[in-house]
Amino acid sequence: MFPPVQDLYRIAPEIVLCLFGMLIMLIDPFIPAGRQRAMGWLAFVGTLGAFASLRWMFMNPGSAYSGLLRADTFSLFVHGIVIAVAALAILGSFDYLDHEGIQRGEYYALILFATAGMGILAGANELVTAFVGLEISSISTYILAGFRRNALKSN
């Protein structure tokens, strides 16, 4: 049985972020090494899509999934901040990744997954949901912290 459409509207930003993250991971192996910056632009478009989907969340306030998540003005505000910061982080990392020679698509996918986890954490109405959001964002952040394998600071 599928959840009601209102529940899907209330988690629309997370759905958009995860779909773009999976799309980047599926497309990335087929992109030539010199064109990896396109994955960053695709991730940026994903953050714009998630930001645009906040409208659906705003139009359908209330709880979702039997009270596990809550879509209200506070979670909408936090979602907006988190998605905007992720978009700025993606834009700011283009030249850095080129300079370090580690321009790979999974970097951008991990940023999108971490952003989705923070969004779940922002809308959590139960402790279990908060833990799931925290784990999704923290695992992605741990992987991002060790992304530069050859640097001593990442080890």
Feature map (PLM): residue ranges:
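Alpha-helical transmembrane segments of multi-pass membrane proteins predominantly involved
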Residues: 1-155
